[in-house]
Every structure is written in structure tokens, then in C-alpha cells.
Amino acid sequence: MSLKSWKEIPIGGVIDKPGTAREYKTGAWRVMRPILHKEKCIDCMFCWLYCPDQAIIQEGGIMKGFNYDYCKGCGLCANVCPKQAIEMRPETEFLSEEG
């Protein structure tokens, strides 16, 4: 049995306006950060389907990256990726990049 892509999965329930979550950014408490290795990505969009915070940036069914303002670092995206295209890295590795 092969996995279906996001376009082949029947529509279930969709919350298109998830409360007031967009009003509240994650802040500085995220411990792990997802990193996309685009060369491995097959744009199956499982990450987009499973992300509880709508932090996956996609355009026309193509994975573009992450909205780190809302990503909690839970790792669901990395866990569901069939090609291991998403790696979870410690947030401390990025402190010098952000000042």
C-alpha cells in the first residue's frame, strides 16, 4: 500500500479560521526548529496537513518553508515526512543568526 498525496486524501473537517491563534506568536520558548532540505522534499504536503499551527508555508502545493513566528517546534512535520526532508535542530544553533 502506498501513501496518498495531499491531493488524493478525501476532505474531512477543516478549520479555516482556527480561533485567535494568529494573534499570538510563539515567542522565544521554542526548543527545536524544523529545517527543510528541499533536495529531499517530494512536496507530498504531509507536513502541511499535520502541522497543528499552520506554520508550513506552501504555494500551489509546493513546500516553501516554515513560518517561524508560529512554529512551536513540535516536530510533527519531521515525523510524518516520508523522505526525511525535515530535520529538527536545537534552537540554540540559531541564536547568533538572530542577534
Swiss-Prot record:
Q: Does the keyword Ribosomal protein apply?
A: no
One GO MF annotation is: metal ion binding
Using the record's annotation, list all stretches that form the 4Fe-4S ferredoxin-type domain: 32-60, 61-91
Q: Which Gene3D superfamilies does this UniProt record tie to the protein?
A: 3.30.70.20
Q: Which positions does UniProt annotate for [4Fe-4S] cluster 2 binding?
A: 51, 71, 74, 77
The Swiss-Prot or TrEMBL record lists the needed cofactor(s) as: [4Fe-4S] cluster
Q: What does the record note about the cofactor?
A: Binds 2 [4Fe-4S] clusters.
* TM segment ranges: none
Which PANTHER family does the UniProt entry name for this protein? Answer: PYRUVATE SYNTHASE SUBUNIT PORD
The protein depicted here goes by the name: Pyruvate synthase subunit PorD
